[in-house]
């Protein structure tokens, strides 16, 4: 028997306004919720029970997971108070009969990891804990790892001058008995250092695939567009989508179910979700349009993220903005770079100042 704990209870304040109306784990990544990549990987492994640690908008996560038909035993655990990322491990271990080896993974990271190979590696090294590591371009944003062979020696959180580009990928395997020793809120700041001080063997599993911690909007944009290039270099159009013969499509692109693209419009390096309507003569470039978006004629969306059920009028230009769910933008409106518009707002006048927040 193998148990897994998926941590998906965070507030995701740095991803607002996107996370104000949906939990970070359910933000769409190339047409499906972020958490699904982890859940399907777990479902294809030897894991038999998946524990979901939830807090913020837990009902939305549960409703979604029920529709997945994972054919695994799913147990939801609702955090009644803030427990950090370490607290749920101790709580779940005290309440349920976990397996000897427990996989722990954050629900807000992207990684197509083979959990069976991770378990095999963990068991082969004979350590009580295994941490998954990945290499990144900017390690100063993460927990940087100092290793000796396959063993973890030290973890340094967000150093100004990183000693390496090897960082904590947020996927672990712990021996069940270790979870009783948790007395802090953070795995990387409290629990792992305590294990290392007590000379507990922590092995490091090298992960070489595509990985991203979806912490801020630019991370969210980046993982979507990188995955788009990787999965659909020639583009993808759903069979139920209707794209005008006079529209121009420049790969890579993704056009979801029941979406229409009008004549004279162009889609370039962008992800268009489900039930969207792109008017005539409009352009979408390096952007993400979630679901049920209405884009009027002769408008331009560039380097932006547009939430669900957003309605944009004609002759609009949105340049490098993040727009929350349910926003209404009138005709002939310009939205400048780094603008953030909170959900359900109505915008009738242009936003010329960069970095403005529409509350």
Curated annotation (Swiss-Prot):
Family membership noted in the UniProt record: Belongs to the transferase hexapeptide repeat family.
A GO term, aspect molecular function: mannose-1-phosphate guanylyltransferase (GTP) activity
Entry's Gene Ontology BP terms: biosynthetic process
The EC number(s) this enzyme carries: 2.7.7.13
Keyword ATP-binding: no
Record organism: Sulfolobus acidocaldarius (strain ATCC 33909 / DSM 639 / JCM 8929 / NBRC 15157 / NCIMB 11770)
Keywords: GTP-binding, Nucleotide-binding, Nucleotidyltransferase, Transferase
Listed PANTHER family: SUGAR-1-PHOSPHATE GUANYL TRANSFERASE
SUPFAM superfamilies linked: Nucleotide-diphospho-sugar transferases
Protein name listed in UniProt: Putative mannose-1-phosphate guanyltransferase
Keyword Plastid found: no
Reaction it catalyzes: alpha-D-mannose 1-phosphate + GTP + H(+) = GDP-alpha-D-mannose + diphosphate
InterPro entries: Mannose-1P_guanyltransferase (IPR050486), NTP_transferase_dom (IPR005835), Nucleotide-diphossugar_trans (IPR029044)
